[in-house]
Amino acid sequence: MTRSAKKGPFCDTSLVKKVEVAQANKDKKPIKTWSRRSTILPDFIGLTIAVHNGRQHVPVYVSENMVGHKLGEFALTRTFKGHAADKKVTKK
């Protein structure tokens, strides 16, 4: 079930404040956040946000296509190392 349209998108207030400060100062340093649940707003375009994935902060450069998605979608939490290779049995 999706979020109600009348409520609007959710974004952590602390993240919004950090974005406003970064835009006012024309700062290009990544903004560190643990808020994976925050929706990407149009104000975030052009900024780099370091999203926590449980171990480290993954830098995510926000583009126009990302608006409306959640920050957590772009910082993967699980590392896929591949499936085990098939062991071929040779007859003697």
Curated annotation (Swiss-Prot):
Q: Which HAMAP family match?
A: Ribosomal_uS19
List the Gene3D superfamilies: 30s Ribosomal Protein S19, Chain A
Give the GO biological process terms. ribosomal small subunit assembly; translation
InterPro entries in alphabetical order: Ribosomal_uS19 (IPR002222), Ribosomal_uS19_bac-type (IPR005732), Ribosomal_uS19_CS (IPR020934), Ribosomal_uS19_SF (IPR023575)
Q: Name one GO molecular function term.
A: rRNA binding
The protein's superkingdom reads Bacteria
Q: PROSITE patterns from the xrefs?
A: RIBOSOMAL_S19 (PS00323)
Protein name per the record: Small ribosomal subunit protein uS19
Q: Which family does it belong to?
A: Belongs to the universal ribosomal protein uS19 family.
Q: Which UniProt keywords apply?
A: Ribonucleoprotein, Ribosomal protein, RNA-binding, rRNA-binding
